[in-house]
Regions:
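Glycine-rich, N-terminal phosphate-binding loop of Rossmann-like dinucleotide-binding domains
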Residues: 10, 53, 200-201
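Dinucleotide-binding Rossmann-like beta1-alpha1 core, especially the glycine-rich loop
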Residues: 46-122, 126
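Helix-loop-beta segment of a Rossmann-like dinucleotide-binding subdomain
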Residues: 81-89, 124-154, 158-162, 261-263, ...
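Helix-rich C-terminal "cap"/substrate-channel and partner-interaction subdomain
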Residues: 281-402, 406-418, 422-463
């Protein structure tokens, strides 16, 4: 066999499973069709760590709660920015209050004692700055926020350093059963393996039949980053409970404020501001720093591991709490594989991620020390987010380094500022071209057909 395990899909779950399996004496590959890994994490590099009480599906709720309990351990291990903060689900009328009561009943049924049902002004004890006529709320203490892309990258980078082969820009075309394994045909090659772990959403590749119909019922999520420190507004995440809508406000890891609104219609961002205004006090268009879109799914989680004896595991997590679920799910899938293949732990497993610098978070003394070692850190490329050339170069040279403008942007924050990359994008393209030994016209934004500079008016020796 070419590989012991082939993981289809290099999203956060595929990378997390690769990390857990890289601890053992296995030959592993991850096949990802995109230029980069972890493209399924939100472009705004902060995800909510949920508790599971808001979820009615039993399996989803269990996975979320178990993942929540593991998250702090993994964040500390990988040195990923992570912040614990409580969540308040609020109801402004009797209809909304029914949802609050259901959540509280679920908590009692599961013997979860750390949630609190608050009536009327009791909420002010937990969030004194909240305004409006709130008749009922539920307080959940063990939620939080995490740098989701950093977490996903950490999984991938450590797996790569421990021997996992990441095959990017390679699309799976077919999977066929053979004696004691599978034959995989991709757009570039053919492989055999003992076990396939399919984390993709492409039903055409799945060998098992599902009763669930494939659909696209995801909600449209609109994020707005508000130019106000979150600590001046609230200390907890605030969810305004609505039927078929999600309205919330939460901090980012950098203490910025995110307001979010979602429903099944792709609304204009003016509607988003209107919806989140009751939670954000006085805001205007001038307070909006960045606007981003995302798709929000709440589909049942499918984990078909009952056919592990045949060597095929199908995982489908099209769910808003995917980041929260990941640690527990990956740990359990790896246990199944280890038991199936009877493999042993690597003595030379390296569980450390290579360090990196966030220049804007350092003191002047720390900055000067780094600049003495590498002068590239003394040249600021992104003025909005204070990202240096040294950070961009490091993001390209790291394990599974950036190969696109979006890859640099997500790893470093360059281009996420109020100018949305107008000032720094050309410079990022130059650095990418130089580091990859390519022409600037060959550098892409995020995918094969997303070239930014189409042609040159005149050829120069340098750009």
């Amino acid at each position: 066999m070419d590989y012991d395990v082939l993981i289809l899909g290099g999203g956060i779950i595929g990378c997390a499973i690769a990390y857990e399996l890289s601890k053992y004496n296995l030959n592993i590959a991850v096949i990802e069709k995109d230029y980069d890994i972890c493209n399924d994490t939100p472009s705004i590099n902060t995800a909510t760590i949920y508790d599971g009480l808001e979820c009615e599906d039993e399996l989803s709720s269990k996975l979320i709660r178990k993942g929540n309990l593991l998250m702090e351990e993994y964040a500390l291990r990988f040195k990923v920015p992570y912040k614990r903060c409580g969540t308040l689900y609020i109801a402004r009328n009797e209809i909304q209050a029914i949802s609050i009561d259901k959540m509280y009943e679920r908590a009692k049924a599961k013997k979860i004692d750390d949630v609190k049902l608050l009536i009327g002004k009791e909420i002010l004890e937990y969030e004194p700055n909240i305004e409006g006529n709130i008749i009922k709320s539920i307080y959940i203490p063990n939620t939080g926020v995490i740098s989701s892309y950093d977490l996903a990258l950490a999984y991938g980078e450590i797996a790569f350093d421990n021997g996992v082969n990441f095959r990017l820009q390679e699309e799976v075309e077919s999977i066929n059963s053979i004696n004691k394994g599978f034959k995989i045909k991709t757009s570039k090659n053919k492989f055999t393996c003992k076990i396939v772990i399919d984390t993709t959403k492409d039903k055409n590749l799945q060998l098992v039949n599902e009763n669930n119909k494939e659909d696209d019922k995801g909600k449209y999520m609109k994020y707005v980053v508000i130019d106000k420190p979150y600590e001046k507004l609230y200390s907890n995440i605030i969810f305004d409970v609505r039927e078929n809508e999600r309205i919330y406000i939460r901090p980012t890891i950098n203490n910025e404020t995110i307001g979010a609104y979602s429903n099944y219609k792709n609304v204009h961002y003016d509607k988003v501001i209107e919806k989140i205004k009751p939670l954000t006090k006085e805001i205007s268009e001038n307070d909006i720093k960045v606007v981003r879109d995302w798709r929000l799914f709440d589909e049942p989680i499918i984990i078909q591991d009952d056919i592990i004896n045949s060597g095929y595991i199908n995982i489908k997590v099209n769910h808003y709490a995917k980041v929260t679920i990941t640690p527990y799910l990956a740990l359990n899938i790896s246990k199944l594989v280890v038991e199936k293949l009877n493999c042993k732990f690597k003595k030379d497993f390296n569980d450390k991620r290579r360090e990196y610098f966030r220049f804007k978070n350092l003191s002047n003394e720390e900055r000067n020390k780094i600049i003495k070692l590498d002068s590239k850190y003394g040249r600021i490329i992104c003025q909005c987010e204070k990202v240096s050339e040294g950070e961009i170069v490091d993001s390209i040279r790291r394990p599974l380094g950036a190969r696109t403008v979006t890859g640099v942007k997500r790893r470093t924050g360059a281009g996420f500022g109020s100018c949305d990359g107008c000032y720094c994008k050309d410079k990022i393209i130059e650095i990418l071209a130089r580091e990859m030994d390519k022409r600037v016209t060959e550098v892409v934004n995020n995918s094969k057909d997303s070239t930014i500079l189409l042609s040159r008016i005149k050829e120069f020796d340098e750009m």
